[in-house]
Swiss-Prot record:
Protein name: CTP synthase
UniProt-annotated binding residues for ATP: S16, L17, G18, K19, G20, I21, D73, R240, D241, A242
Pathway assigned in UniProt: Pyrimidine metabolism; CTP biosynthesis via de novo pathway; CTP from UDP: step 2/2
GO-annotated cellular components: cytosol
Note: CTPSs have evolved a hybrid strategy for distinguishing between UTP and CTP. The overlapping regions of the product feedback inhibitory and substrate sites recognize a common feature in both compounds, the triphosphate moiety. To differentiate isosteric substrate and product pyrimidine rings, an additional pocket far from the expected kinase/ligase catalytic site, specifically recognizes the cytosine and ribose portions of the product inhibitor.
Glutamine amidotransferase type-1 domain residues: 292-540
Residues at the catalytic site: C387 (nucleophile), H513, E515
Record: residues binding L-glutamine: Y56, G360, M388, G389, M390, Q391, E411, R468
GO biological process: 'de novo' CTP biosynthetic process; CTP biosynthetic process; pyrimidine nucleobase biosynthetic process
Regulation: Allosterically activated by GTP, when glutamine is the substrate; GTP has no effect on the reaction when ammonia is the substrate. The allosteric effector GTP functions by stabilizing the protein conformation that binds the tetrahedral intermediate(s) formed during glutamine hydrolysis. Inhibited by the product CTP, via allosteric rather than competitive inhibition.
Source species of the chain: Methanocaldococcus jannaschii (strain ATCC 43067 / DSM 2661 / JAL-1 / JCM 10045 / NBRC 100440)
Amino acid sequence: MKIMKFIFITGGVISSLGKGITAASLGRLLKARGFKVNMIKIDPYLQIDAGTMSPYEHGEVFVTEDGGESDLDLGHYERFIDENLTKNNNITTGKIYWSVLTKERKGEYLGKTVQVIPHITNEIKDWIKNLGEGYDITIVEIGGTVGDIESLPFLEAIRQFKKDVGKENVLYIHVSLLPYIRAAGELKTKPTQHSVKELRSIGIQPDILICRTEMPISDKIREKLALFCDVDKEAVIEARDARTIYEVPLNLEKEGLGKLVTKKLNLPDREPDLDEWRKFVDRVINPLNEVTIGIVGKYVELKDAYLSITEALIHAGAKNDTKVNINWIHSERLESEEFEELLDRYREDNQLDGILVPGGFGDRGVEGKINAIKYARENDIPFLGICMGMQCAVIEFARNVCGLEGANSTEFDENTKYPVVDLLPEQKEIDAKGGTMRLGAYPAILMEGTLAYKLYGRKEVYERHRHRYEVNPEYHEILENHGLTISGKSPDGRLAEFIEISKNRYFIATQAHPEFKSRPNKPHPLFDGLVRASLGEKIK
């Protein structure tokens, strides 16, 4: 029987330290050594999943292949280790309690008093162990900060792990902040010392300290942290601010993290194969070209709401030796009559080589998105629409090309005369919000000779989805008769999955979320095409 190894990553001092990037980077280093790696994100909130959470609260909702609506860190994991994860790889307090209470109602606890310890903690451990089956190493990131009340059951569960599977099979890594006090000109270790003290009071002694810092860590500071936090000096790892998140694995490898982890877990330390990763990072850091894509969205105040889109643009940019700048344009700014003047100014200032309209929900800012699409279509600016972005493209085309004045989606206007976008038939009897959309990977059949077919290079494609509305099949014919090509449909021919306008040099949209499948070594074709078209290339 294969011995499973578990690595638990906690965070201290403040949130948003980069635990997710640290975990993903370690996953990359271990996979580069030939190990089979799985990754888990624990979120100590009471929701079952992230699906009902506002982008302003939680950033984007990352959709897995099997339809899980999960934390955005799963996106980092997938991109860094180049593996598809599942909905089960995101554990929440809600999922754990739901499972325990369901078992209690079934009488599975045989009359025992159901308590946090042992029932909740056992459920957490069982979930992690089950996900670890078949893997050499499972990396588990504990969301939140040590000291948070809501994290305590998870911390207790991972404390017990070393007794359950043997301490030689468990590694604890603590990510903490070393703040730099400019007035004093020095890094301060006290917050990290107190964070480790808090962790040790729970019964967890970290094996490795990863210190987030904007300045180099001196030997003196390493020795001090090693002494007060009871770790080896070599286990104090510097994690300085990087030029790109994709440089972090290389920086941590230079610090000796990969070698240290394999040593502490009694695993063979093989030479990591990071050549392709280094080439990718070099292209990101040293581009030869530059373009600016305008992202017209509703949630642009919080860039994490579109995280996978920005990463997909980085991947496509690197493939084309191009730095992709993003011009964040709030869609509500384009709802005035002067929207064309604003977009004209962006073009004159070289701030609008291409336009991307991402997904979203609700009618706020929708007319601004429609105006941006009209501008892209009429001025032949490379355009990519995603999910709601495709629906808005259909509305714009129906109004301004087909002559269907007032055409709309029933999401925005239930009484529209021309419902060119309508609720999916299977959604019409559903009232619950959580986990009820059309979620996960679905196939589409592409029409040969179209732009979509040229970009993908094959007839059948699978993309991830997250939507309730579709292009109304009753309007397919009139749209196509006026020059809109429905270049990809569901296998039954009912649902429009891709649309394009062939007379424009690059005008394409999809009902799916292609950004979730883009990887550093495999940029998504739609984003690659957008960057190439924005550079002036004709897509052949």
